[in-house]
Amino acid sequence: MAYSPRKRARSQTPHLHTLVPTDAEKPTLQGFAGYKVGMTHALMVDYRPTSTTSGQSIQTPVTVVETPPMKAQGMRCYRRGPQGLEVASEIWPGKEGGGNGEGKERELDPTVEEVRLLAQTSPHLVSGVPSKDPNLMELGVGGGTLVERIEYARSLLGKDVNVRDFTHEGDMVDVCAVTKGKGFQGAV
C-alpha cells in the first residue's frame, strides 16, 4: 500500500536513480550515509505559513541519525551513451599512487558529464548497528564546473569525508531509507 515494491530489499544500501542538479558555485557532495539510532521529540516553532499552528511552539517527533565519517575509496566519471550513463573513466587509489588518487587511472574522456565519488561507510563506529561490514556507495558531486568537480573528488580520495562536507547545521535534507522488512508483523 504505502511502499512499492512490496518485497524484501536487495541490500541495506538505498538506491537513488536520480540526482538533483545543484547550482552551487563550489563543488559539493550530493549525498551521505547515516544510521538510525532512535527517535525522540523536539519543541520547535511551526515554520509552515498555512498551518493552523503557524508561528506557535509545537512538539514534533524526530528521528536521530548518526553519521560516522565515510572513507573516499575511488572516483568514477560517467558519459551519456545509447543505453544511458556509462563509465568513462575511474580512479582507484592503489599501491602505485600511495593512496592519493594517482593509482589505477584511465585516460580522462572529454565526453564526461557526471562525476561520482565511491565512498565506504563506517558502521563499526556506530553502536547498535548489527552489521559491522562497510557498504560501498556512489555519492554524486555537484556544483561548479566539470573540471572543478573532478579536482574536488580527486582531493577527497583516500581521506575521511564528514557530514559537514555534505550539509550544514540548520539545512533541510531529503532522506532515503531501507526498512528492515518484518513482513506482516508490526506497523508499517
Where are these regions (language model features)?
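Extended basic (Lys/Arg/His-rich) segments that typically form rRNA-contacting surfaces
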Residues: M1-V188
